[in-house]
Amino acid sequence: NNLDAAMVDRLILNDERIEAMAEGIEVIVELDDPVGKERVIGTRPNGIEIKKMRIPLGVVCMIYEARPNVTADAGALCFKSGNAVILRGGKEALDTSLAIAELMQDVLEKHNLPKALVTVVPNPDRALMQELMEQRDYIDVIIPRGGEGLINYVTDNAKVPVIQHFKGVCHLYVDKEANLDKAMALLLNGKTQRTGVCNALEGLVVHQAVAGDFLPKVADAFKEKGVKVHVNEKGSQYFDGADVISEDAYGEEYLGLEIAIRVVDDFEAAVDHIAQFGSNHTEVICTEDAEKGKLFQRAVDASVVMVNASSRFSDGSQLGLGAEIGIATTKLHAYGPMGLESLTSEKYLVNGEGQIRD
């Protein structure tokens, strides 16, 4: 069907992935329900007491490509957080999504709950998707999850608020104080463990002070793994036959065995590169300088910023959320992996004893 390797990888549901889906739901079951939780804001001078309470968003519409596991994750997360969910998946995984939703609906009905709480749109026609995106009276938020084209289409055409889950152009910066063995492990895990996912590494930034020691080893490892390298002029001497990359070619989400590399003069240049070409998803520094790590975490604008840990941990299941509905790359109303709490909002609770405003 002319599907690329990244798409095929997302579509596959083998025993291991089915077990992982089930385990994710079991973790969600054990998590605290955020709905109804109150936090005290304070008491005003006039005596009124102010709190805020967690409430569901309402009706969530997921628009996604491939990834049948999204059907299970989104259904479980939305139900646990008190939301109804409409799931509009891609045609490639439609039968699988319908089968998963049917299982969830059977369980809902057995417990005298409306099966419409988890609904899969059975027709992937784009005209129907457009109609869904215009239902401001019935849908509270749309969460698109997929390729850049889908995200842009939904953002440009929806009349319902959208939480964007944009592409994952994730970088590893190898600092001059890096442990190069750690850096190599982070690089190979982030780039080659699973390439067709949004938390895979797409960029490597290396301080010039360690480039001579590190990049020849990278060249050997990538040759063995079959990784195609695009590198700037300063780093090209370490790679035989690598493409010398143009400035405007950085920022690509390859979703395969390809990577863009830049050798930089200093820490500030690394941060500038990430600011220009990252996608606010996940960024990693490898350094033994704790203060440099903290500075990186403060300076870099991304939903997840890591020190000496693989970008592949940028995932709801790995961060203790059980599963995620996606990884938000815009700051409204959530940022990063979205779990139960991200599927709620807050309302004010104000208690008084008859106070009136002067």
Language-model features: where?
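A structured beta-alpha segment of the ubiquitous adenosine-cofactor-binding alpha/beta core
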Residues: 14, 27, 45, 49-52, ...
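Substrate-binding/gating loop at the entrance of the active-site cleft, primarily
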Residues: 41-85, 90-100
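N-terminal Rossmann-like NAD(P)+-binding subdomain of aldehyde/semialdehyde dehydrogenases
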Residues: 1-50
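Short, well-ordered beta-strand elements within core beta-sheets of diverse protein domains
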Residues: 205-206, 256-265, 280-285
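C-terminal core of ALDH-fold dehydrogenases
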Residues: 272-357
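A glycine-rich helix N-cap at a beta->alpha junction
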Residues: 106-120
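ALDH superfamily catalytic-core signature
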Residues: 66-84, 103, 110, 150-256, ...
